[in-house]
From Swiss-Prot:
Binds 1 Mg(2+) ion per subunit. It comes from Stutzerimonas stutzeri (strain A1501) (Pseudomonas stutzeri). Heterotetramer of two alpha and two beta subunits. InterPro entries: ATP-grasp, ATP-grasp_succ-CoA_synth-type, ATP_grasp_subdomain_1, Succ-CoA_synthase_bsu_CS, SUCC_ACL_C, Succ_CoA_ligase-like_bsu, Succinyl-CoA_synth-like. Succinyl-CoA synthetase functions in the citric acid cycle (TCA), coupling the hydrolysis of succinyl-CoA to the synthesis of either ATP or GTP and thus represents the only step of substrate-level phosphorylation in the TCA. The beta subunit provides nucleotide specificity of the enzyme and binds the substrate succinate, while the binding sites for coenzyme A and phosphate are found in the alpha subunit. Its EC number is 6.2.1.5. One of its GO terms (biological process) is succinyl-CoA metabolic process. GO terms for molecular function: ATP binding; magnesium ion binding; succinate-CoA ligase (ADP-forming) activity; succinate-CoA ligase (GDP-forming) activity. Its cofactor is Mg(2+). It catalyses: succinate + ATP + CoA = succinyl-CoA + ADP + phosphate; GTP + succinate + CoA = succinyl-CoA + GDP + phosphate. This is Succinate--CoA ligase [ADP-forming] subunit beta. It holds the Pfam family Ligase_CoA.
Length: 388
């Protein structure tokens, strides 16, 4: 689950971290009023969406009058912002963040992520702030500085000082960086975060450090124990298919291809996508129905897959372990009939009662193509998607 920038900065402020004075507004009138509350002669207005690249897409602007702030809000509220991180439909804008203008001398990067290899929280810092950090890591990995947090003792000031010196900070800047580093580490731990970024962390013209942006991603497996963050969720930013899948405890991720995939087990699902790619196909989604592939869940899975107009064929790849393949076949037949599937469906069943399940599918009279192996299934679904 992601938070908006204004929500992330609210959390930063609670931990005493330096952020700009600002207000999240949902009307042009409130945008103008926010300028009065903040004071000054220049403000920054930012469209609030769960995506990067807002500035290049026109979603961030420096304004010099209340009328400009009002006009920006009028332009973007209830519209969709398309950036390089969104699909062609973009993300809906329901709030605008109006902030005091910050005079910047230099931009840095500071972020933290759960590193699965070390099973630790790892902080990353760089002198290359305000740009895509993934590109920096790819092109100039030596510019990424790291500090690994020991979960038994937490973030230590000496780690922050080491990073600060490598970033070229001096005097009071080092003390300020230690404060920000330790505060962010505590925030990361307290709220079960998966990722946190301040990009950019800026040095202002007066020499002080300032958190100019806030990106926060919460571990979805820990949301149940973070009611405060759960209440911050903005469903309008979620893919409606992924939201539908979550209600049925289906793991679904939309992709750009035209072959729908329904598989039980995340590892098998990834392997299925790989072999479809190997044979020239492009998966339209990742969908793991889990161990409880009941007729009801299979029906909902079909509905979700077919809600994507790009889907030209569907591959169902099920391994019957605890759940028998004949029961799965029953569910597939019932789902295809209920949903009224118009595209070819290729089914590969393996495991418990696989032969009986395959027989039921072949005798169903439906447009279901049986496959005798995963390779055969991939070849057949690619041909079906191409209309061959």
């Amino acid at each position: 689950m992601n938070l908006h920038e204004y929500q992330g900065k609210q959390l930063f402020a609670e931990y005493g971290l330096p952020v700009s004075k600002g207000y999240a507004v949902d009307s042009p009138k409130e945008a103008a009023e926010a300028c009065d509350k903040i004071g000054g002669t220049q403000w920054v207005v930012k469209a609030q969406v769960h995506a990067g690249g807002r500035g290049k897409a026109g979603g961030v602007k420096l304004v010099r009058s209340k009328d400009e702030a009002r006009a920006f809000a009028q332009q973007w509220l209830d519209k969709r912002l398309v950036t390089y991180q969104t699909d062609a439909n973009g993300q809906p804008v329901s709030k605008i963040l109006v902030e005091a203008c910050t005079d910047i001398d230099k931009e840095l990067y500071l972020g933290a992520v759960v590193d699965r290899a070390s099973r630790r929280i790892v902080f990353m810092a760089s002198t290359e702030g305000g740009v895509d950090i993934e590109k920096v890591a790819h092109d100039t990995p030596e510019k990424i500085l790291k500090a690994t947090i020991d979960p038994l003792v937490g973030a230590q000031p000496f780690q922050a000082r080491e990073l600060a010196f490598q970033l070229g900070l001096k005097g009071d800047q080092v003390k300020q960086f230690v404060h920000i580093f330790v505060g962010l580490a505590q925030l990361f731990q307290d709220y079960d975060l998966a990722l946190l970024e301040v990009n950019p962390l800026v040095i202002k013209t007066d020499g002080n450090l300032h958190c100019l942006d806030a990106k926060i991603n919460i571990d979805s497996n820990a949301i149940y124990r973070q009611p405060k963050l759960r209440d911050m969720a903005d469903p309008s930013q979620d893919d409606p298919r992924e939201a539908h899948a979550a209600k049925w405890e289906l793991n679904y991720v939309a992709l750009d291809g035209n072959i729908g995939c329904m598989v039980n087990g995340a590892g098998l699902a990834m392997g299925t996508m790989d072999i479809v790619n190997l044979h020239g196909g492009a998966p339209a989604n990742f969908l793991d129905v889990g161990g409880g592939a009941t007729e009801e869940r299979v029906t909902e899975a079909f509905k979700i897959i077919l809600s994507d107009s790009n889907v030209a064929a569907v591959l169902v790849n099920i391994f019957g372990g605890i759940v028998r393949c004949d029961m799965i076949a029953e569910g597939i037949i019932g789902a295809v009939r209920e949903v009224g599937v118009k595209v070819p469906v290729v089914v590969r069943l393996e495991g418990n009662n696989a032969d009986l399940g395959a027989k039921m599918l072949s005798e169903s009279g439906l447009n279901i193509i049986g496959a005798n192996s995963l390779t055969d299934a991939a070849i057949q679904v690619v041909k079906a998607a191409e209309g061959k």
